[in-house]
Structures are given as C-alpha cells and as structure tokens.
C-alpha cells in the first residue's frame, strides 16, 4: 500500500553528500534534507577535502561537474547546486559568473549592478534568479532540477 500523504518522511537508506564547503549552503540544504527524512553528510563529516573548479559555461554544467566530482570522490550520492542572476538589459549577465563578475563583496556586486542599470526605466530592468540542482550517484546516474524567480532590479 502506498504511503499516505500525511505519513512522516521515511529516512533514506543511503546518506546524501552535500557537495559544498559553503557553511550557509550546507546549513540550508541540511535543514531541508533532514526535514524530508534524508540522512545527509558534508565533506567535513566524512573527511573529504575537494575543490572542484566550476569550468562549465552554464549553471547546469557547473552543478553537474560538482555533483559528479563529489560522488566519485566520496562513493556517496552527491547533491550540488549552482545559481545566478540573469539581467535582461545586460544580455543575461552576470549569469553563471554572478559570484565572480565583480571582485569583492556582495555589496560591491550590488553597487556595480545598480550602476550598470542607472537611467534605465523600470520596465527595462527585468531579471531572474536561477538555481540548478544536480544529484549524482557514483554509478553515473544523474538527476537535475531547476528553479527560477522572475522579477525586476529596483
């Protein structure tokens, strides 16, 4: 008999590795996965030190690169993400390079973005935030998902 929608989530048999060393990202994923009954681990939990270069041209490519690298190194299914802001007036930039398009802090990137859009009418400030997840298994299986939020830069 299938589980009732009100049944509590069942714990996963195999832990999932959160393929990130970013403490904020790890805490967010850990909270979501645990609430769903998923046993999750971090690279530090299993003594794994791995830096993966984000060499992809798209958010999807970067998420897949990271998930596959962590799955291969750990022997565990591994969940990775990549995200970015795409601004219509900037031809979709900064996109996949959102965290690197302006050196420095988030505040510096916000300031640069607002300066780049200065003088544009609100209707020309369309943008979207995209986040892509990739779950890779050591045997090569792969599952991906994407979410996006459409909006306007103030």
Which residue ranges define each predicted feature?
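Anionic-ligand binding patches
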Residues: 2-17, 21-154
């Amino acid at each position: 008999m299938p589980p009732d929608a009100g049944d509590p989530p069942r714990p996963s048999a195999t832990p999932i590795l959160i393929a990130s060393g970013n403490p904020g990202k790890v805490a967010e994923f850990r909270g979501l996965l645990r609430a769903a009954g998923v046993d999750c681990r971090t690279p530090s939990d299993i003594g794994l030190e791995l830096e993966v270069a984000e060499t992809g041209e798209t958010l999807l490519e970067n998420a897949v690169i990271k998930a596959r690298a962590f799955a291969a190194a750990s022997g565990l299914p591994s969940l990775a993400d990549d995200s970015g802001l795409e601004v219509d007036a900037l031809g979709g930039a900064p996109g996949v390079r959102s965290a690197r398009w302006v050196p420095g802090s988030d505040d510096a990137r916000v300031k640069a973005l607002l300066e780049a859009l200065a003088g544009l009418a609100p209707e020309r400030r369309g943008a979207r935030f995209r986040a892509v997840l990739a779950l890779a298994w050591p045997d090569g299986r792969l599952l991906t998902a994407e979410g996006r939020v459409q909006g306007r830069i103030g």
